[in-house]
A protein has these predicted regions:
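The feature primarily captures lumenal catalytic ectodomains
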Residues: 1-234
Length: 234
């Protein structure tokens, strides 16, 4: 998103080095590679704490609309989605892989340090129900970044627990059907993202079965009969 801002005013190829706050995660380096960034130009501010430069170019936040960062984070503008599609969908290679039309996002591979505090306690029942409805369970952490883009771009129905994986909704085709499981205080960032991308969004909102430790923490139990009805109504 910040690169989009830079592209409008400077030639990115003229930049000697790009400083990022973190490049530890696999998808970070993969996305930069797809954007044709040379690994020799990528610096992590965690490793390089003090730098000296003749010219330093810094971007502002790409969508700071108000003085409320919580509100701004939940209202991603359409131009960001359009830019992501423009940059990454064009890199998808035509292949014979048969991507599933219905996917369930399994978060058991989540690298979040609080993932153990946010689980679906009846997930086995959910997976059994979705399997009968021809859903394929997908662990995003097992996939490359471009494979994740392919899965979401080819999907017609997506179900999953609120989490960072839903950022890939940016790559969905219009009218893709979404069901998000979330707690009462999670916010509407995924719903707003789906709306901006013209997706058909639905949610199942649950109270935590145990004491919640924060807005996004606490185990939940999904009402199977409600999920079954929402799936059949799609």
């Amino acid at each position: 998103r910040r690169l989009k801002i830079c592209e409008k005013v400077i030639n990115l190829e003229s930049i000697d080095y790009f400083i990022f706050p973190d490049t530890k995660k696999r998808f970070q380096l993969e996305t930069l590679r797809e954007l044709n960034f040379s690994s020799n130009k990528i610096l992590s501010s965690e490793k390089f704490r003090h730098l000296k430069a003749e010219e330093l170019i810094i971007t502002n936040h790409p969508y700071n609309f108000t003085d409320d960062p919580h509100y701004d984070a939940q209202h991603i503008p359409k131009w960001i989605i359009q830019w992501l599609k423009e940059k990454f969908l064009k890199n998808l290679k035509s292949n014979t892989k048969n991507y599933p039309k219905n996917i369930y996002i399994d978060r058991s591979d989540s690298e979040s340090n609080v993932s153990h505090l946010r689980k679906i306690i009846n997930e086995k029942e959910i997976i059994e129900l979705l399997k009968r409805e021809k859903f394929t369970t997908v662990r995003l952490g097992d996939l490359s970044f471009l494979d994740q883009v392919q899965y979401f771009n080819n999907a017609e129905r997506i179900v999953g627990l609120h989490g960072a994986g839903f950022a890939n909704l940016s790559f969905c085709k219009e009218k893709t059907k979404i069901i998000e499981f979330r707690m009462t205080d999670t916010g509407k960032v995924i719903e707003n993202l789906a709306d901006t991308n013209n997706l058909e969004f639905n949610s199942i909102i649950c109270k935590p079965v145990s004491h919640a430790l924060g807005a996004q923490l606490g185990h939940i139990k999904i009402p199977i009969e409600i999920l079954d009805k929402k799936i059949k109504d799609q």
